[in-house]
Swiss-Prot record:
GO biological process: ammonia assimilation cycle; L-glutamate biosynthetic process
Sections of the chain in a coiled coil: none
Protein name as annotated: Glutamate synthase [NADPH] large chain
Gene: gltB
Keywords for the protein's UniProt record, in alphabetical order: 3Fe-4S, Amino-acid biosynthesis, FAD, Flavoprotein, FMN, Glutamate biosynthesis, Glutamine amidotransferase, Iron, Iron-sulfur, Metal-binding, NADP, Oxidoreductase
Pathway where it operates: Amino-acid biosynthesis; L-glutamate biosynthesis via GLT pathway; L-glutamate from 2-oxoglutarate and L-glutamine (NADP(+) route): step 1/1; Energy metabolism; nitrogen metabolism
Enzyme Commission code: 1.4.1.13
A GO MF term: glutamate synthase (NADPH) activity
Naturally occurring in which organism (per UniProt): Halomonas elongata (strain ATCC 33173 / DSM 2581 / NBRC 15536 / NCIMB 2198 / 1H9)
CC cofactor note: Binds 1 [3Fe-4S] cluster.
Cofactor(s) for this UniProt protein: [3Fe-4S] cluster; FAD; FMN
Binding site for FMN: 1049-1101
Domain of life where this protein originates: Bacteria
Length: 1482
């Protein structure tokens, strides 16, 4: 067993991808050259290893070049290939004996199936173009030629598939044996080289005889730097850009469905150990699954639409027959959910498809020579504008295919209409499927439990008064989860000295960097909790029986629905109840679980379909098996036996009351849950008067609240459907022993051992002892707020009082008292179980580096002006500046009057809401921090209630006073690692002097993400613990999301050292740090910088009342309420300065004791720590060695950062050229016009000039002496990003994603090339997420935009000719006019600004999001002013772009005006709209 938190084989990957095909199937060498050119133009989307030369992998998958293969077979083997043949492209070990074994095994399997092996060809390669790391692991690359035998007939591809799979199985321990492709239709060329070197490496690719008609290409960006040759893409059918979030569930389900994958073509597939691989990349598993479906005889289009369906459950405008097709498919396979741009070919068709959220870009062009090219970016190869026949993009849930045999280009509608009419799906569903209805019998009526029995159950299942009041009451009253503030300062379950629920061990995972979270409120259209009841059937057959299922709209059952479900008379839904009660006198917990699994297996083999796992009706002397243990154990046991798809697991439990507890059950495999105890407790609360109203309504509200909570937990991980989440185990178990994990939660992370079956049983026995004592009342709780004598809180009244006394008086002896309270407490965090080893001879204190050297290592954590009062925010900034540390502005912008003064924050934060992020804000920072996640609520957005948005905050955030401000869960320009690299590049261009920091939250796998961040050229990484604070967050997030920094920090430190990147990047940690001892331990675990959030607030007077979210903070620290601030804020700059000086003093004393003079000598020195025995049985079973040792880390690897900045590979040459040309015009304010050529490799163009202007002239920019730049060509990503006032950019050509992102002024104008022949309003001209977070300026584009145009726009004016989904999302200001079609979900979360939308086909009413906006016609008399305004807007647009579409509208204005809608927030008055738009000029 290898020790350590980071394993080198862990990775995530994202990339650039594409395909090119000749529509008539004409093969040519030119097509191949064009593909390689396109691939090379996306080099910036890939990654480069630490050696600067090894790529993360790129490759090509070609339609079989028949004539070339016949010639090389003749030359190399002296054989004439017959009519049908296959070529294998194979990596073999670089060792004679191992190579021979690989060859012989594969040949034997092929021969066994009656195929003729003709021989092997050595593929000519040039290793000199490889980097050192690629050379190190370079395999022997061979091609194998095979022909069908006499008997083979039409099963040639099946025989090749089965032979290869059997060979792989036989060679599973030989990791250097890999079959890239083995097919009669396609052949693969891939490897660990840079795209530009691919044709030099493979001589075949430079051979003009090699001609093909289809080529799929891919360029990889992996988060680790130990790339492997087999992981390069494309795989055998597809190349995938994105990340399958539900991969563990998809793999588990696929492998348990063996019997459902047998078909006439695949009769013996059940012989395989695995249907899809369970290790390796998610994309390769997806490729395996697709390959099984196609080999089994399924049509390519149906297979991919089944694996990655579009959103269909909530789309009102979807055709009924098409919905039936998706519903029917969903009954037998769950979606592979997550960001996915997929390109694939089977040798005849070339196909591209996007996931339901459309989170990867895909742009296509058809040219006159018959080529169709599709790629992550437009402009990846050089064509003349006049040769373009059509261009467009693939949107969310869309698919595009080219059939090279018939020459057809098939769009989404064409493919969907073929699929939906293949079988009478709608009729079958009508006849066979039914929604579960409530049972109306007397038996089904809810029966209240008597008070005495209920008291026993509440004690046994650990329900406290606090849970009744804080969790169940808000759910029952309003259908909302309880909200709290501050962080979680209680011990984790494994460290607690009290009995804690098993679900408290589980920490929710969340998406960060490599994939985005989703907004479950504003994007509900893609979310679904629908579940199917009934046994799954064979996927290759289509019959009415396949539709014979019961459908649950929600998986949390009401009493009546539960009764209806378990009393079905239909044998297809036969049920059996399995009791979870066991007698501890005769059996232990582990034996009880084994017996339960055996019982479940017997029921499944006996044709029972519903297995009801129940802990209701416990009797005295019995203990309940925890529902999560039971579900996990049964799910895995039946999965291993391939029985799981035959049954549904229904859980009747007292252990699931809140959304987190439910999510744990679904995550480990439950189908539906009936929370019997929660319903009984709510009935009791009605009896006691804690709840008023109708009990049935309370139960209904409770279920609604749980559904919202479940959506939030799914969406944190970027998952849309419960069907995909079920069994995905997206948790980390902190502190559960391997025996528990192996039996019940196989494959879930648990890294430090801990509580085993014996300890779990012991805790239950203690609970049972009290439960049956009538005099023992139920517990008060104390998990949310401090209750004397209950759970320990790190910020208890004694600690707060001691800290405030020390800093108010500036008394170091009082500080010692505070430090002792924290440092000498019983273990409450993981670091409390680590003790320092004093040196034999301490160092004299005067030899230790002085306080002044240590203070610059301390930062205050990001807290926005909005969450904090202005007084508190400025006091923090001033104190940090005076001590030499750095304060962080948080995500609410900063008042420009503070720039350049002692009250300015050196760290400026860029969060998902982009509030107040202007060029001047960015230019006035020493560090730019990208806040990817927040410790208290990772994977979630934020919300500043309207009550806190006063005049000042509205001005700083470019919003309207009194209107709620929403920040989205993800950054809409970070859906993947290469997107983050782009944002870092944008920031380094606008402010080349600043360092860029990325804030992450601890979770398993954060090491791989951090190496990706380092490879994306960040300068700093902050690792936050789960216990960070927040101004407002759902209680389930505060308590259950994210992991401790003590696990995340050493994992990142180890990962960076293993990957040779630790010397390039600074590491910081934050979350619950209070004393000098915390700093010392963090340094030893790998940090060189330290962040403090809550403690400085407490130093300023915060009393930790946890009411920040209510805006009535009693100490004036976290409120905008003027009276509270004036009368109660007592904080001073000195209090904060005392706090940080005292920490530094304590750090020095401890360094002296350890015999260390410089803090840098401490970093990573885990030999100075030792683990101590804990005080509880669970604590004693913990194994903290993975934090301290990693067997993969090279001993000589640096322990800390050794460079000033991590310089990007791309110097941004175009920006240098633009700035050099304009320098004089900017410095002398002399104006001017300049011309430049541009390509898609020129990214963030304009940013360097804008940053220079903002630094020199502030927000005003060059308004009085504007400068114009004109470009021709195709612009790379982020054209016009952070555009300053007075800078005008004109582009003739196309642009990619993020045009005008964060612009603050000036103009960005984009028009099609003069020679183009297509209609602009039907053609994409700019990419996704344009104008994100813009605060001013004007954008005109004569063409359509992609997804999320104008997301978080708070002041820019824009006119475009069409838009994708989610246009104007979260908009708070400005104007958007769309002169053409829009996608769905227009105006979701829009609280300011307004839009004009042309709706010629009258579908807009179904496309806008009705929650916050309303629409008005513009052609009425009352709207005369708006009509005039709209006309002026279009006239200006035509004057700037010459748009034909605009001209047509103006010429027939009286007719077109009838089709326009005005879209505005419900909260805004019509009269005020025009005043606002006129107030915000350029």
């Amino acid at each position: 067993m290898n020790r350590g938190l980071h394993q080198p084989d862990e990775f995530r990957d994202n990339c650039g991808f594409g395909l090119i095909a000749h529509m008539e199937g004409q093969a040519s060498h030119d097509l191949l050259k064009t593909a390689i050119e396109s691939l090379t133009c996306m080099t910036h989307r890939g990654g480069i290893a630490a050696d600067g030369k090894t790529g993360d992998g790129c490759g090509l998958l070609l339609k079989m070049p028949e004539s070339f293969m016949r010639e090389v077979a003749r030359e190399a083997l002296g054989v004439e290939l017959g009519e049908r043949f296959a070529v294998g492209s194979i990596f073999l070990p670089d060792d004679d004996a191992r190579e021979a074994q690989g060859r012989e095994t594969l040949e034997a399997e092929l021969t066994k199936r009656g195929l003729n092996v003709l021989g092997w060809r050595e593929v000519p390669v040039d290793p000199s173009v490889c980097g050192p790391m690629a050379l190190d692991c370079l395999p022997r690359i061979r091609q194998l030629f095979v022909e069908p035998g006499e008997e083979t007939g039409d099963t040639f591809d099946v025989d090749l598939f089965m032979a290869r799979r059997h060979a792989e199985q036989a060679l599973r321990d030989e990791e250097d044996f890999y079959v890239c492709s083995l097919s009669p239709e396609v052949v693969s060329y891939k490897g660990l080289v840079m795209p530009v070197d691919l044709p030099a490496f493979y001589h075949d690719l430079g051979d003009t005889r090699l001609e093909t008609a289809i080529c799929v290409f891919h360029q990889r960006f992996s988060t680790n730097t130990a790339p492997r040759w087999p992981l390069a893409q494309p795989f055998r059918l597809l190349a995938h850009n994105g990340e399958i979030n539900t991969i563990q569930a998809n793999r588990g389900w696929a492998n348990s469905r063996k019997e459902n994958f047998t078909s006439e073509r695949l009769p013996d597939i059940a012989e395989l150990d695995e249907i899809v691989n369970t290790t390796g990349s998610d994309s390769s598993s997806m490729d395996n699954m697709l390959e099984v479906l196609l080999t089994g005889g399924m049509d390519l289009h149906r297979a991919v639409r089944m694996m990655v369906p579009p959103a269909w459950q909530n789309v009102e405008i979807m055709d009924g027959d098409l919905r039936a097709f998706y519903e029917y498919n969903s009954m037998h396979a769950e979606p592979w959910d997550g960001p996915a741009g997929v390109v694939m070919t089977d040798g005849r068709q070339a196909v591209c498809m996007l996931d339901r959220n459309g989170l990867r870009p895909a742009r296509w062009v058809i040219t006159r020579n018959g080529y169709i090219t599709l790629a992550s970016e437009i402009g990846t190869y050089d064509y003349r504008p006049e040769d373009v026949v059509a261009k467009g993009r693939v949107g969310p849930g869309q698919i595009l295919a080219v059939d090279t045999e018939t020459g057809e280009v098939l769009h989404t509608e064409d493919i969907d209409s073929r699929l939906k009419s293949a079988y009478p799906y709608k009729r079958w569903l009508k006849q066979e499927a039914s929604y579960l209805e409530s049972a109306l019998t007397e038996l089904a009526r809810f029966q209240n439990m008597d008070a005495d029995t209920l008291a026993v159950q509440q004690k046994m299942f650990q329900i406290s008064f606090e849970e009744r009041d804080q969790i169940l009451r808000p759910l029952a009253e309003s259908g909302q989860e309880g909200v709290g503030s501050m962080g979680d300062d209680t011990p984790m379950a494994v460290l607690s000295t009290k009995q804690r629920l098993l679900t408290d061990y589980f920490r929710q995972k969340f998406a960060q960097v490599t994939n985005p979270a989703i907004d479950p409120l504003r994007e509900a259209i893609v979310m679904s909790l629908e579940s199917c009841i009934g046994a799954e059937l064979n996927v290759f057959k289509a019959t009415p029986e396949h539709a014979h299922r019961l459908i649950l709209t929600t998986p949390v059952l009401s009493p009546r629905k539960f009764t209806a479900l378990v009393t079905q008379e239909d044998p297809a839904f036969a049920s059996q109840t399995l009791s979870l009660a066991y007698d501890p006198e005769t059996t232990g917990l582990k034996d009880a679980l084994q017996a339960l699994c055996a019982e479940a297996e017997k029921a499944a083999r006996g044709d029972k379909v519903l297995l009801v796992l129940s802990d209701a009706n416990l009797e005295k002397g019995q203990l309940p098996i925890h529902a999560a243990l039971a579900v996990g154990a049964v799910h895995h046991h039946l999965g291993r036996l391939a029985l799981r798809p035959r049954v549904n697991l229904i859980v009747e439990t007292g252990y699931a009351r809140d959304a987190h507890q439910m999510a744990v059950l679904f995550g480990v495999g439950a189908t539906a849950v009936y929370p019997w105890l929660a319903y009984q407790v709510m009935a009791d609360m009605h009896r006691t008067g804690e709840l008023v109203g109708n009990p049935a309504d309370a139960r209904e509200n409770y279920r609604k609240g749980l559904q919202k909570g479940l959506f939030k937990i799914l969406s944190k991980m970027g998952i849309s459907t419960l069907a995909s989440y079920r069994g995905s185990q997206l948790f980390e178990a902190v502190g559960l022993a391997s025996e528990v994990m192996d039996m019940c939660f196989t494959g879930m992370a648990s890294r430090i051992e801990g509580t085993g079956f014996a300890e779990l049983q012991l805790q239950q026995e203690l609970l049972a002892k009290d439960a049956w004592k009538p005099r023992k009342s139920i517990s008060h709780g104390g998990l949310m707020k401090y209750v004397h004598g209950h759970e320990y809180h790190a910020y208890n009244p004694d600690v707060i009082k001691a800290l405030q006394e020390a800093v108010q008086e500036g008394d170091y002896t009082k500080w010692k008292k505070f430090a002792a309270l924290v440092n000498e407490r019983d273990p409450a965090t993981i670091r409390d179980l680590l003790r320092l080893k004093p040196a034999e001879t301490p160092v004299p204190l005067e030899e230790v580096e002085p306080v002044e050297n240590l203070l610059p290592r301390f930062d205050s954590a990001g807290m926005s002006l909005g969450a904090l009062s202005p007084e508190a925010h400025e006091a923090l900034a001033q104190a940090m500046n005076e001590t030499g540390g750095r304060s962080n502005s948080g995500e609410g912008g900063e008042d420009p009057v503070r720039y350049g003064t002692i009250r300015s924050s050196k760290i400026k934060q860029i969060a998902s809401g982009r509030f107040g992020v202007t060029p001047a804000y960015l230019a006035n920072a020493e560090v730019l921090q990208i806040k990817v996640a927040q410790g208290a609520k990772p994977g979630e957005g934020g919300q500043l209630p309207g009550g806190k948005v006063n005049e000042l905050i509205a001005r700083l955030r470019y919003a309207v006073p009194g209107v709620t401000l929403i920040s989205p869960p993800p950054h809409h320009d970070i859906y993947s690692i290469e997107d983050l690299a782009q944002l870092i590049f944008d920031l380094k261009q606008v402010n080349p002097d600043a360092q860029v920091s990325v804030k992450l939250v601890s979770e398993p796998g954060i090491g791989t993400i951090a190496t990706g961040v380092a490879k994306a050229y960040a300068d700093l990484i902050t690792v936050s613990g789960y216990d960070g604070g927040t101004a407002a967050s759902p209680l389930t997030s505060i308590k259950h999301a994210g992991s401790p920094w003590e696990l995340g920090l050493p994992e990142v430190h180890q990962a960076l050292r293993i990957n040779g990147l630790r010397d390039k990047i600074r590491l910081q940690t934050d979350g619950g740090l209070k004393t000098g001892l915390d700093v010392i331990k963090a340094a030893i675990l790998g940090a060189e910088s330290f962040g403090f959030g809550t403690a400085p607030m407490v130093a300023l007077g915060c009393k930790y009342l946890r009411i920040c979210h209510l805006n009535n903070c009693a100490t004036g620290v976290a409120t905008q309420h003027q009276v509270l601030r004036d009368e109660h804020f007592r904080g001073t700059v000195d209090m904060v300065k005392h706090y940080f000086r005292f920490i530094a003093e304590e750090v020095r004393e401890l360094m002296a004791m350890l015999g260390v003079r410089q803090l840098t000598d401490l970093i990573g020195r885990t030999d100075l720590l030792e683990a101590i025995e804990g005080v509880t049985p669970s604590q004693r079973r913990l194994d903290l060695s993975p934090l301290m040792t990693n067997d993969f880390v090279p001993a000589e690897a640096p322990q800390f950062c050794q460079v000033d900045r991590n310089v990007p590979h791309d110097p941004g040459a175009k920006n240098q050229e633009v700035l050099a040309a304009m320098k004089t015009a900017i410095e002398q304010k002399s104006g001017g016009e300049f011309e430049f050529a541009i390509t898609n490799c020129d990214r963030s163009v304009g940013a360097l000039a804008s940053g220079t202007i903002a630094k020199r002239y502030g927000e005003a920019g060059l308004e009085d002496a504007p400068v114009t730049a004109r470009f021709r060509g195709v612009a790379g990503q982020s054209f016009g990003v952070w555009n300053a006032r007075g800078l005008h950019l004109y582009l003739e050509g196309d642009a990619n994603d993020y045009v005008g992102k964060g612009m603050n002024g000036g103009r960005v104008v984009i028009v099609p090339p003069r020679e183009s022949r297509f209609e602009s309003h039907k053609t994409a001209i700019i990419g996704n997420t344009c104008l994100y977070g813009a605060t001013g300026g004007k954008l005109f584009a004569s063409g359509t935009a992609g997804e999320r145009f104008g997301v978080r726009n708070s002041g820019a004016q824009a006119v475009i000719e069409g838009a994708g989904d989610h246009c104007c999302e979260y908009m708070t200001g400005g104007l958007v006019a769309v002169l053409g079609e829009t996608g769905v979900n227009f105006g979701a979360g829009m609280t300011g600004g307004f839009a004009y939308v042309l709706d010629e086909d009258r579908t807009f009413v179904d496309k806008y999001n009705h929650e916050l906006v309303e629409i008005h016609r513009v052609n009425t008399e009352a709207m005369e002013a708006h009509r005039r305004h709209l006309r002026e807007v279009i006239e200006e647009f035509v004057a700037e772009t010459g748009s034909q579409r605009g001209r047509d509208i103006l010429e027939d204005f009286s007719d077109f005006i009838r089709h326009f809608w005005l879209v505005k927030p419900k909260a805004a008055s019509l009269a005020s709209l025009l005043d606002q738009s006129r107030r915000q000029p350029e």
